Amino acid sequence: MACFHFLKKNTVEENVKKEHQDYTSDGAIDRHGHPAVRQKTGDWVAAILILVNQGLATLAFFGVGVNLVLFLTRVMGQDNADAANNVSKWTGTVYIFSLLGAFLSDSYWGRYVTCAIFQLIFVIGLVSLSVSSYIFLLKPSGCGDKELPCGSHPSYQTVLFYVSIYLIALGNGGYQPNIATFGADQFDEGDPREQHSKIVFFSYFYLALNVGSLFSNTILNYFEDDGLWTLGFWASAGSAALALALFLCGTPRYRYFKPSGNPLPRFCQVFVAAARKWNVKVLQDDKLYQADQQFPINEGRKMLHTQGFRFLDKAAFITSKNLKQMEENKCSSWSLSTVTQVEEVKCILRLLPIWLCTILYSVVFAQMASLFVEQGDAMDTKVSSFHIPPASMSTFDILSVAVFIFVYRRVLDPLVARTMKSKGLTELQRMGIGLVLAIMAMVSAGLVEHWRLKHAIEDCNECEGSSSLSIFWQVPQYVLVGASEVFMYVGQLEFFNGQTPDGLKSFGSALCMTSISLGNYVSSLLVAIVMKISARDEMPGWIPGNLNKGHLDRFYFLLAALTTADLVIYVAMAKWYKYVKFQGNNQNEINKQDPEFGL
């Protein structure tokens, strides 16, 4: 009989263990709302669908964005400075909308629904742009190439154009931070194999983004530069529609997370509760309030108490008044917060200085879509009888990203891990390397421009190829920017996704997108300030319509100097940063994958 009970006990334990292995440990659910079965959901099957979706959507987006500055000058009749500013503002708006998408995703809709809705808006914007360009904007027929400018446009046509491109901005912006996080959701951090796959996913995600833009920067770019704008826009619309269809096909396979509700009240509760206990002195951590350690499957991991921002700990300090309220079941979240709530606020406060330091890098990155293109347009773009569209030079940026992702993952990271006996470079260290490479890119661009001016043809306003210097001299600056992206943007995606609370993962990805957004706005502001200061006393300024009369090289050197100052501040902030500490489903299980301090 004892043997029978022993066997029965072992069988029960094995069944419990098997059930635990069958389901993910991170609280993911399937499309029916049931706990996600590890073998039937997520992993690379779902992630590959998301990567292909990202590639197609990026193709569609850059089919518009990469040549937008030329569309504004050739079709809409804007000068170089205005066109560069408008592209920076539009690109900035794309990523500002990422905050809206992240908020709706984390709070109410969930990542899957948010991705589907904003992708639909994206498709509508592209179709609208294609139709309006064909019917209204490209008149006379065949205009918009380098030789035949288009005529003027009435107000309603201009309004329709801007409505179309800002619908594209809304759709792509709201979708981008959520698709990155949704892809990461397909891997369970509680499983060592899937945890490693999740880290690798972000590199492949950025690679998919660049591979998608490769077609835009070559084939579509060539068509559009030759005046075939409508064909390019329709190809982008078709690619976006295919991306949406493919995304929906993966619905049965995806892993989902329920939205955690609006985080703003939770944050406000911490500040209000701390303010109510302003005169209280917190001496012992064990008096801080933490809810039941065993949390429901659909809630995020609890965060462990950290030092720093000690005044916020007062919100979780249990006073005698709180004890009495708890006994009477009258305790309010506005008078007592959990340690996890407090740590969520601390987490965001610690991230902000790092995030602010990434904005100036995005100013450098923004030059590829504007001033790099205008600089290339003023160089010799002919190879034998073949004309190279200036925007297609960003192909070297894409190839650089692909090469450096491989070099980093396969060579550099393992080498550093063996040499330093660690897990390789941290995200913060990689972002610092990205800033160094960005400085080198601006110095390279400035030197090329200085050399281009020496070869420039004096007083050449309209002639083709206003400098005899080959456009291929731009290759180093594109390659350096591409290398910097691998360290900065991939590092950002991993860092912000890993260091934000479980209920704010899309917000973490949106921080990366918003950095790009503000970088474009700062770029636009910087160009305006530089032109206002430099274009005085009848001087043409640093960035005039005819670059041969300006000093674009000085602007690049200015950016290099500003980025150097930003690097110094970044290093100080990274050393100050403290990594978050999560607690798993088992209260004794604490994540130890990150060091305590930043650098």
Task: Indicate where each model-derived feature is located.
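Hydrophobic transmembrane alpha-helices of multi-pass solute transporters/permeases
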Residues: 2-144, 151-599
